[in-house]
Amino acid sequence: MTQLKIFLISLAVFFIPFIIPGFRNVNSLIIQSEDTVPSIFTTISIIKDQTLYLDKYYVMMRDRYPHPDDKDFQKDLTPFYLRKIDGHYITAFPIVTSIISIPVFILPVIFNMPLTWDNLALLGHLSGALIMALAGLFMFKTLREGFDLEEKKSKILTAVFLFATVNFAMLSQAMWQHGTLQLLSILGIYFFLKHQKNPNAYINMLFSGLFFGFAFLSRPTAGLPILLIELYLIFTNLHKIDNLFKSATTFTSGLFIAASFFFWYNSVFYYDIQNQGYSDQLFGSWLSPFPVSFLGVWLSPSKGILIFSPVFIFSIYGLYLAVKNKIDKAGLYKIFAVIILLHTLVISLWKHWYGGWSFGYRMSGDVLPYFIFLMIPYINSVYFEKTKKLFFVLFGLSVFIEIYGLLFFDGIWHAAYDLGFENTSWLWSIKDSQFLFDIRRVLVKLGLMASACPKCL
């Protein structure tokens, strides 16, 4: 019953504001990013046309969301979120989110729902909310059953995961790949921990590998946890060679099933792995001004992890306690910390480490479950009782920031200040930060200021 309540409450909190007219009057952005547009149409195409090709919907997508360099359609550039292969248009992004969203779309599509942008946004929003609500449900199950955390504390950390992070303002609001990756990664960890408790139940390692494999198909950044979890498995089972061999084999078998699916649809629809959307970014997109970009991932006034979710300070403290006190699963907590560190390091090297036109630290959303897991040593310690007030203050502040993002993220701040990846000084300005810009927007509406962007006049 508790799990059902968590699922239903989170789904309602994520989805209901979108259908309230008053909310739409405050934030009229119905689809957060064109990155999520092909996922919507891929789901429709799978159901309606039994294909991944988006030829029927290309004009509709291009007219609403053209390539940034082709706004007048004079060059007819294929939008960056699509690929043109052998005369067919296909999504440039992974398709796992589209597949998971089929249950949401199937009845409206079968009954010929009109393909208007409002209808599509509604279904896309419901899909994003549903995926994140499921992620919250399995986060709670993992905390309770995998880490043996008591119910009250599991609810607190699940609430942090759902509402004090970009999961609230961003990833639950559209068909982002990040939400799918989180759901599948949590399931991978859940079954891995079940195997740790019952080493002879190798089916759990098969499921762990399967879910981690599909997480990787959702976003390539999920490859880091796979490698590190496997290394942890090896080094903690060297004294049990037979068990280690069977565990590693079943885990790898799960990965193989996911890989087989990828190679099948890649050969049928993409023909060559080089036609996959991320392939052309593999060698030419590592252009960030490191280490400034790495500091930006964590501390940028308009994008930093610790700025938008200051409650994560307790994740860092949790790691410290795990290492200092050598608690149960201390090695696993170290692995979680390395996953976060390597992910933020890799992202900081990529030219769009700040996530393009998005709210907060979207690009680091992939590792949010590991931030939550690192809070376990803290919330289980005597220091939680001593610092409980500070924890809930930062928790509340983090939730407030997400509600603010839900209301104010509409791309206007980016339109006013975004200088692209070649000059990232705009990401460090406090005076022109997204927070202060939006305060000025409110003052303009109240007639107390002439413009929210004085330099734009």
Label for each model-derived stretch:
Residues 197, 224-256, 316-329, 373:
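Perimembrane helix-loop-helix junctions
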Residues 113-118, 136-164, 183, 199-203, ...:
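Transmembrane-helix signature of polytopic, membrane-embedded enzymes
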Residues 13-14, 154-165, 190, 212-216, ...:
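Short helix- or helix-capping micro-motifs
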Residues 180-198, 203-212, 226-232, 370-374:
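Specific aromatic-rich, kink-prone transmembrane helix
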Residues 1-24, 31, 124, 144-145, ...:
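Start-transfer (signal-anchor) and selected internal transmembrane alpha helices
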Residues 122-148, 186-191:
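Transmembrane-helix motifs of polytopic, lipid-linked glycan transferases
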Residues 234, 307-330, 334-337, 371-378, ...:
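Hydrophobic, aromatic-rich transmembrane alpha-helices
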Residues 228, 245-320, 335-347, 368, ...:
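Membrane-lumen/periplasm interface segments of specific transmembrane helices
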